[in-house]
Amino acid sequence: QMIYQLRDGHIVLESPFNRYQYYDWYQSDYNSNLINANYLNYQLQEGQTGVYSYGRIQDILYVHLASFKGQKKPFIELAQIIEASNNTTSGIILDLRTNGGGSDVNAHLIAKEFINNFIRIRWIRYRNGPDHYAYSRWISNELTPKQHNYKRPVVIITDRSVFSAAEDFVLALRQLPNVFVVGQFTGGGSGNPMTRELPNGWIIKVPRWQVADPLTKELYEGIGLEPDVILMQRTLDTTLGIDRVLDFSINYINNLNDN
């Protein structure tokens, strides 16, 4: 009950006999079976370890980024897929629904595929004392662009299940002129927990920093990142075999290319 009061999935208490963590996350409206059947003609391909899947919708590359957890290898593979699609697609849809985070190194590895200038991606400050406002000075984090970046329209789909490193990914890309974010607010949890052993041998993990928007320096903890357009899947949409957020994303890219 003590852990649940904090409503933060980055806080974990581990004992030899149990693990205590906040699990009452927001439910995602992502439906992989619906998308695979009705949008990808059952041609959805899964990457290594299942952290991403992808396919073509018309001439748009669709990527579901399920997680940023694990080793770098699958994300290097995905980066190569994105780079190879630069001249063969009219746009990319990056679906982050269900992505609860993972490694910001992996998130930034993919983000680099889209930036063409040296950019600030976030401000961070670390907890450094017991007082309520005991934090370090703000530290700027930047990303260096790749030589060849994806230049066509990009739509990112978010909902309340998007947390942590996945929010880092959104923070980095949403400032780009060719990137549009649609869906719902993200979950609002930056985390970066540190691990400590208690005197009784139990292990506790607690968040140790705050992350702020790279442009406004606004905090989003407990609030989330607002999309450019708020759009939610309805029960009727699912019954009809429609993903209205994905439909919007497809039409958005097609309309840009028609103009």
Regions found by a protein language model. Name each.
Residues 100-259:
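C-terminal "post-core" interaction segments
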Residues 1-126, 131-139, 197, 203, ...:
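Flexible, low-complexity junctional segments that flank or bridge functional domains
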